[in-house]
């Protein structure tokens, strides 16, 4: 792993005054960053599909307030919980413990987030749409941390990251989605930061390290081979290759991208196929049938997969990939009986869990196919994840204690960063694609979700 520090020198002809030293220190800590307006980025559709803030209707104002409250809560938690330290600063914690009124800092799998469910994407898109300096500062710190500490830069697991744990590198589960280049592309292209460029380049051949990780190894009579999932493994490779190709125009990575898209398009059910494939190092994905015991379908769409896919489709002008996404976004929301009918009985029992995680790809499908029923379904699931009849508190913090100085200590008792990152990201993207399908009033929102079972409420 890595931790990079910067040293900036200022040479003066005389002894530096205190004011000059403070000015210099402030400039080093907060160097100027050239940015365009949010409207300019949005007009060029920089970094995929994301919305500008609008508060023309009651429901839009509610969603924008929730997005603002969500970010402000995490910004304040960084200070309140002292999420600092050489190896920790920039990351946030994974799961809150309402009994102890603290984050589960001491429980493996519930401590540091390590990019799980892409809080990086949520924060960077939130910055692009708001232009807020404080958002940039938090997102920058996360990119600097995650691009250094959370993955292996060389060695047998080069380009592979470590899943969340009490220590960032402590989990035995090593995955490419933790380290994929897409986490940091926005920061790199906004600043040209050379160290981030190096870190992204360190991931370009992460697929070649998979043979060294036991979890991805299989054996048959011919020897060992690698098996990967369509997401988040293949999607992470695509992110790495896309970034390397757009920076270098190296055709090697473009061919690996095109090979995989071709392979998936020839599978019987497109992106729903598998979801695991035998993988060859030229990017070839070998379909080996359907796995009805797989629990991994939601991992295709909650680890940045849709964002990688649709940026890639736009970059390449790839109609095949656009069609694959449009079909899969609708397929995810079908009932098990409908899936069984569509696949001639081959896909039925496999869980397509967390339907609200699929809001972005569902919104993409509804937008491109003009499917109003699907659009309504997407909003139902996304809204009901945060609110339900009788509970519209959302991300409003509550006071759990006051200290000797009468300072209030705040919490959101049910919060998980998995939920925060995915709800923030999916709301930002769905507002762009399906704003017209959102009810204007909160009464309309209540009517939309009143028949929802409620089992996805605050679930992540």
Residue ranges and their predicted role:
Residues 1-457:
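Catalytic cores of extracellular degradative/oxidative enzymes
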């Amino acid at each position: 792993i890595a931790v990079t520090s910067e040293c900036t020198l200022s040479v003066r002809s005389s002894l530096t005054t205190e004011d000059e030293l403070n000015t210099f220190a402030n400039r080093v800590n907060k160097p100027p960053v050239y940015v365009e307006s949010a409207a300019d980025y949005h007009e060029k559709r920089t970094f995929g599909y994301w919305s500008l803030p609008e508060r023309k209707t009651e429901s839009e104002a509610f969603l924008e307030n929730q997005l603002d409250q969500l970010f402000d809560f995490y910004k304040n938690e960084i200070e309140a919980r002292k999420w600092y330290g050489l190896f920790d600063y920039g990351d946030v914690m994974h799961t809150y413990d309402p009994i102890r009124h603290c984050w589960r800092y001491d429980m493996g799998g519930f401590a540091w987030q390590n990019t799980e469910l892409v809080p990086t994407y949520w924060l960077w898109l939130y910055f692009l749409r708001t232009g807020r300096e404080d958002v940039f500062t938090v997102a920058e710190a996360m990119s600097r941390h995650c691009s250094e500490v959370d993955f292996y830069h060389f060695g047998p697991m080069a380009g592979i990251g470590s899943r969340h744990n009490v220590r960032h590198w402590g989990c035995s589960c090593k995955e490419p989605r933790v380290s994929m280049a897409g986490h940091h592309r926005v920061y790199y292209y906004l600043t040209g930061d050379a160290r981030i460029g190096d870190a992204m380049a360190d991931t370009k051949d992460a697929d070649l390290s998979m043979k060294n990780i036991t979890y991805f190894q299989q054996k048959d009579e011919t020897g060992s081979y690698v098996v990967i999932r369509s997401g988040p493994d293949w999607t992470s490779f695509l992110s790495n290759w896309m970034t390397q190709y757009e920076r270098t125009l190296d055709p090697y990575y473009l061919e690996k991208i095109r090979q995989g898209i071709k392979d998936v398009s020839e599978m019987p059910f497109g992106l729903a196929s598998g979801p695991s494939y035998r993988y060859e190092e030229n990017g070839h994905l070998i379909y080996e049938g359907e796995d009805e015991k797989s629990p991994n379908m939601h991992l295709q769409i909650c680890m940045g997969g849709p964002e990688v896919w649709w940026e890639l489709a736009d970059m390449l002008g790839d109609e095949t990939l656009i069609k694959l996404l449009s079909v899969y976004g609708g397929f995810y929301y079908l009932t098990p009986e409908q899936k069984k009918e569509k696949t001639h009985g081959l896909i039925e029992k496999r869980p397509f869990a967390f339907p609200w995680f699929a809001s972005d790809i569902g919104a993409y499908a509804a937008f491109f196919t003009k499917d109003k029923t699907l659009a309504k379904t997407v909003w139902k699931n996304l809204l009901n994840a945060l609110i339900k009849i009788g509970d519209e508190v959302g991300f409003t913090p509550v006071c759990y204690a006051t200290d000797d100085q009468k300072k209030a200590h705040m919490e959101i008792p049910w919060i998980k960063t998995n939920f925060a990152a995915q709800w923030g990201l999916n709301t930002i993207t769905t507002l762009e694609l399906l704003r017209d399908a959102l009810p204007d009033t909160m009464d309309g929102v209540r009517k939309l979700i009143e028949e929802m079972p409620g089992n996805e409420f605050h679930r992540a």
